[in-house]
From Swiss-Prot:
Keywords for this protein: Methyltransferase, S-adenosyl-L-methionine, Transferase, tRNA processing
Cellular-component GO terms for this entry: tRNA methyltransferase complex
Organism: Leuconostoc mesenteroides subsp. mesenteroides (strain ATCC 8293 / DSM 20343 / BCRC 11652 / CCM 1803 / JCM 6124 / NCDO 523 / NBRC 100496 / NCIMB 8023 / NCTC 12954 / NRRL B-1118 / 37Y)
Name recorded for this polypeptide: tRNA (guanine-N(7)-)-methyltransferase
Positions with a binding annotation for substrate: K126, D158, T199, E200, Y201, E202
């Protein structure tokens, strides 16, 4: 969903370039992302961070991991980063990329990212837009290019069609998972919901009684 523009967004992002990296700088940062964090530790990347509730929650819950939230919408990335900054200042283990998730391999070297998260991605329901889905084969190739061998992609959605499409896409690409790695109703599963950090969309869909689908797939 496209957010209404915020007049303050552009200036705020420019003033906080230490925590929000634009696309050009992100490309130049390849192989050197650890230098932006206080400590060298595994980097987890969320593609399509929206307003940032998930990535902030994860960074607060797991200080032993460095997190990067990537978002293409200026308003969304500004809201996410400012919310984080206003609540807790500059977190030592959280940075953002204001950029496109298409071509993520131009930002990171092989193995530089330890895990990729996709949360409530745009389903792009029309067949002619299939290649825009973040679980389409060209995106999977990009994720594989930055993850270590057998790297993991974690995907959550409320959209049953997109979930089924994604499972087929993962399988066709050669990715694997076990029965313990997926659920058709996350919040009805006491074991799998442990440690779950909710997104803004997730909370909205839960309030409507819609099931949340989740899978962890490995290359």
């Amino acid at each position: 969903m496209h957010l209404r523009s915020k007049p303050w967004a552009s200036d705020w992002l420019a003033e906080h370039s230490d925590i929000v990296i634009d696309q050009d700088r992100a490309t130049a940062q390849i192989g050197q992302w650890q230098s932006l964090f206080d400590q060298e530790q595994p980097i987890h990347l969320e593609i399509g961070s929206g307003k940032g509730q998930f990535i902030l929650g994860m960074a607060l819950a797991h200080p032993e991991i460095n997190y990067i939230g990537m978002e293409i919408q200026e308003t969304a990335i500004a809201i996410a980063a400012r919310k984080s900054f206003d609540q807790v200042g500059t977190l030592p283990n959280l940075r953002y990329i204001y950029g496109n998730g298409n071509g993520v391999e131009t930002y990171f070297e092989k193995g530089e990212v330890s895990k990729v998260y996709l949360n409530f991605s745009d389903p792009w329901p029309k067949k002619r837009h299939e290649s825009r889905r973040l679980t389409y084969k060209s995106f999977l190739k990009s994720y594989e290019a930055v993850l270590p061998e057998h790297g993991e992609v974690e995907f959550k959605t409320d959209n049953r069609h997109l979930f089924e499409y994604s499972m087929v896409s993962f399988m066709d690409y050669g990715m694997r998972w076990t029965p313990e790695d997926y659920t058709l109703d996350l919040h009805a599963d006491e074991d799998k919901v442990q440690g779950n950090v909710e997104t803004e969309y997730e909370q909205k869909f839960m309030a409507k009684g819609q099931p949340i689908y989740k899978i962890k797939a490995h290359f």
